Curated annotation (Swiss-Prot):
Protein name: Major envelope glycoprotein
Any one biological process term the GO annotation gives: fusion of virus membrane with host endosome membrane
Mode of membrane association: Single-pass membrane protein
Entry function: Envelope phosphoglycoprotein which mediates the fusion of viral and host endosomal membranes leading to virus entry into the host cell.
GO cellular component: host cell plasma membrane; membrane; viral envelope; virion membrane
Keywords, in A-Z order: Fusion of virus membrane with host endosomal membrane, Fusion of virus membrane with host membrane, Glycoprotein, Host cell membrane, Host membrane, Lipoprotein, Membrane, Palmitate, Phosphoprotein, Transmembrane, Viral envelope protein, Viral penetration into host cytoplasm, Virion, Virus entry into host cell
Gene this protein is translated from: GP67
Family, as annotated: Belongs to the baculoviridae gp64 family.
Chief location bin: virion
InterPro entries documented for this protein: Baculovirus_Gp64
Compartments where found: Virion membrane; Host cell membrane
Post-translational modification: Palmitoylated.
Superkingdom per UniProt: Viruses
Glycan-bearing residues: N76, N114, N271, N301
Amino acid sequence: SNTRVEETMKTLNVGKEDLLMWSIRQQCEVGEELIDRWGSDSDDCFRDNEGRGQWVKGKELVKRQNNNHFAHHTCNKSWRCGISTSKMYSKLECQDDTDECQVYILDAEGNPINVTVDTVLHRDGVSMILKQKSTFTTRQIKAACLLIKDDKNNPESVTREHCLIDNDIYDLSKNTWNCKFNRCIKRKVEHRVKKRPPTWRHNVRAKYTEGDTATKGDLMHIQEELMYENDLLKMNIELMHAHINKLNNMLHDLIVSVAKVDERLIGNLMNNSVSSTFLSDDTFLLMPCTNPPAHTSNCYNNSIYKEGRWVANTDSSQCIDFSNYKELAIDDDVEIL
């Protein structure tokens, strides 16, 4: 029998020179589209597998199943290509012993990938190269740092050095690099951290007699203690703000993600009867919605309330009239002492 159908698909890796040319022309190069080649011409499908000669802005595969020449070999050949420029996640890391730093390019899962301006990375059917080498800058800044002990009455207690830098709190207790994605910070050894002034303790004899007039030194000591407590309070407030901002960003991303599935979510959050349709990742269109009468039916016009949302409905047999509903309270017997 010679009537079988064979379908194959092959991914071609694009070299550095070709990628650079694609970037300049903003087009990608493919081979000739072959349609219904039969007989000896069907051998054309096995030639020219380099994908040359046709420049396009983008192209998708076209699957064909035509066979108009019975008992003859026939073939179809199609190409797919595309070109785009996108930003990649990056992470800065520094070595503690040499103080040398390097920028790593990350994939969507946060794993480092080997893509540079000189090396093409072929991954998941995509060939990619960096258009520009990643760089970083260094600077020296003065930061407000406090020496904090978990238990100031215990000399063995853990001591931490917290520093406020650009509205973020960094723990610089160890003389090592503290890296957070695109930023690495290290405290200079010779720099000093503000310590808590020595305070009176219940197990230490008082330095003055109760009832005596406070000296200038006593007042200066109290002033230093208050200044330290004020700095500590401001640092804790900044730390709280950082956590709140992080939660706000997470909530924003969550709402945007869910709103692409639930078109009424944004309207409900705005307390408006509108439906949202996303035009891009961060742009959406709002359209007014009608408000059905409450507590009458699960259907209204050509819509039905199903799985927590109003959706289109053409089957009237699913509509239920519950205008004579009865409210049910489940906590009537609950007593609070």
